């Protein structure tokens, strides 16, 4: 296969970059009055304005030519057909099947998986309705008032993001908490004010062996039994999202209350699988299906829309443009909606675990930059924190602004103030303020350099009518498919995560060295050995 940087389409982009890299957005807008209306796209309730990027129509044409040369369309079709595109694990990648409508046909190894998906969704809905209605009671007969999801990675980040994003639509009679960190403080604080007799734990681990999750699950079991006293209580206060029936039963959970999913669902793509059980309980099945419908609408748009009108494709190609030609290393996710406060953290896993790779699908080292670093904070908080660097720092960051026209909680003029700030920040980043403009305002000449804004800092804006379950589904799917687009261009596998394995293996070796009663024989590097000895000394253990 041709190396990416040797492709004529890549070299054409390099030539084009050198021709336009110093052109200011002020000039691009001045020379093209229709730019703001033309460089937009819309699908699944999302309006995507990408006019404030350092591109021309020719840039987009060349990026699409690169996508076509890299067989992006064929790769998209292969994913939707259920081919084993996760080559390193020999798995299909079919999170899109999780939100397919009941009558759809999506095959894996010749079998339609959609009926299985809906069978699990139906079981989830029945259980969620039991909990929400009070028909599911705890061991003492009290109804469940508290839901605690125990998971980590994709078993936590998706559910907690979805719950926080859609909290407005949730049943406020239920308290929903999340425990992920193996740090005991996470569990202690999550359960401090809960009544065990009214608490249901959802233990989310496909294998039911994940270290952090099962450590927290065993602690939760002991916490519940300390109050309830009878081993039989476990079956009324714990359910599992897993495929390991033997371990689930050994824990004391009734396997009738085990909700499974499939090896063609990656953890960071699993929030619409049984991993979303806590979301369904909080929102109710009807709202959860609205979430699925939003995902599916964007899935179909990605699958069928021409690349020049395809939101995820354009978004992904713009990321390639900045990562590989401008050398930008970070993307700031800036949601102007406080309900999306966990969205940047969710995207960190989705993007960085997917595309944080340094070898191609064939195992050859890449000779170009791959995954970007994602971070962010809701507006307007970030404006009083890190926006200074975005506006006047020496580093370029790509910014994604996300906003909604209608507030969920209309209070006075709060929402107009919020959205005015979002539009203003994108405008200020793009166009800045010249020294001449600063001086014309009466600024002293000595102060003018400090109050000048270079501008020419790129951003995207995503705008929707309001934050709904369907809108959230479309938004998440847009980023999922943008990640896929980037991975296809870079010729890497966005669906494995071998990078998490080495640290886990080393930790398994260090645990007994920290806990042993006698001084352990240490054979690490001198720094790690010294840190272990210092830790043992501080814990009062022989070192």
Swiss-Prot record:
It comes from the Bacteria. The active site is at 353 (proton donor), 384, 504. GO terms for biological process: gluconeogenesis; glucose 6-phosphate metabolic process; glycolytic process. One of its GO terms (cellular component) is cytosol. GO terms for molecular function: carbohydrate derivative binding; glucose-6-phosphate isomerase activity; monosaccharide binding. Belongs to the GPI family. This is Glucose-6-phosphate isomerase. It comes from Roseiflexus sp. (strain RS-1).
């Amino acid at each position: 296969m041709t190396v990416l940087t040797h492709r004529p389409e890549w070299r054409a982009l390099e030539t084009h970059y050198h021709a336009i890299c110093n052109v200011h957005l002020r000039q691009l807008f001045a020379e093209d009055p229709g730019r703001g209306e033309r460089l937009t796209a819309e699908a699944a309730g999302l309006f995507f304005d990408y006019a404030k990027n350092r591109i021309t129509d020719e840039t987009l044409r060349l990026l699409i030519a690169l996508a076509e040369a890299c067989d992006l369309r064929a790769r998209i079709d292969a994913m939707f057909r259920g081919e084993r595109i996760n080559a390193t694990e020999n798995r299909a990648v079919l999170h899109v099947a999780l939100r397919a409508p009941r009558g759809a046909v999506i095959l894996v190894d010749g079998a339609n998986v959609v009926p299985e998906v809906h069978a699990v969704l139906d079981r989830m809905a029945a259980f969620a309705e039991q909990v929400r209605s009070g028909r599911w009671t705890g061991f003492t007969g009290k109804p469940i008032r508290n839901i605690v999801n125990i998971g980590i990675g994709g078993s936590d980040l998706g559910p907690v993001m979805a719950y926080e994003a859609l909290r407005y639509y949730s049943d406020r009679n239920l308290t929903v908490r999340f425990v992920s960190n193996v740090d005991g403080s996470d569990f202690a604080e999550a359960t401090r004010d809960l009544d065990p007799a009214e608490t249901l734990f959802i233990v989310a681990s496909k294998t039911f062996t994940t270290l952090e999750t099962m450590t927290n699950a065993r602690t939760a079991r002991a916490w519940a039994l300390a109050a309830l006293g009878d081993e039989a209580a476990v079956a009324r206060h714990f359910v599992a999202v897993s495929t390991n029936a033997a371990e689930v039963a050994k824990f004391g959970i009734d396997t009738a209350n085990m909700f499974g999913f499939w090896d063609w669902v990656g953890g960071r793509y699993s929030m619409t699988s049984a991993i979303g059980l806590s979301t369904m309980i909080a929102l109710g099945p009807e709202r959860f299906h609205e979430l699925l419908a939003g995902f599916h609408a964007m899935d179909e748009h990605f699958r069928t829309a021409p690349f020049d009108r395809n939101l995820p494709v354009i978004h992904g190609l713009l990321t390639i443009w900045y990562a590989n030609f401008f050398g930008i290393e970070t993307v700031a996710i800036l949601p102007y909606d406080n309900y999306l406060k966990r969205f940047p953290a969710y995207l960190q896993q989705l993007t960085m675990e997917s595309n944080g790779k340094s070898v191609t699908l064939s195992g050859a080292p890449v000779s170009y930059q791959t995954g970007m670093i994602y971070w962010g904070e809701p507006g307007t908080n970030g404006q009083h924190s890190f926006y200074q660097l975005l506006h006047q720092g020496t580093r370029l960051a790509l910014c994604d602004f996300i906003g909604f026209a209608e507030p969920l909680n209309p209070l006075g003029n709060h929402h107009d103030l919020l959205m005015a700030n979002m539009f203003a920040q994108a405008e200020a980043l793009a166009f800045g303020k010249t020294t001449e403009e600063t001086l014309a305002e009466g600024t002293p000449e000595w102060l003018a350099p400090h109050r000048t804004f270079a501008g020419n800092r790129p951003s995207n804006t995503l705008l929707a009518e309001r934050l709904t379950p369907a809108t959230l589904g479309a938004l998440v799917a847009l980023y999922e498919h943008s990640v896929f687009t980037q991975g296809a261009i870079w010729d890497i596998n966005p669906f494995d995560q071998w990078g998490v394995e080495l640290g886990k293996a080393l930790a398994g070796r260090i645990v007994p060295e920290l806990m042993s009663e006698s001084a352990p024989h240490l054979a690490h590097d001198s720094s790690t050995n010294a840190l272990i000895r210092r830790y043992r000394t501080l814990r009062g253990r022989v070192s």
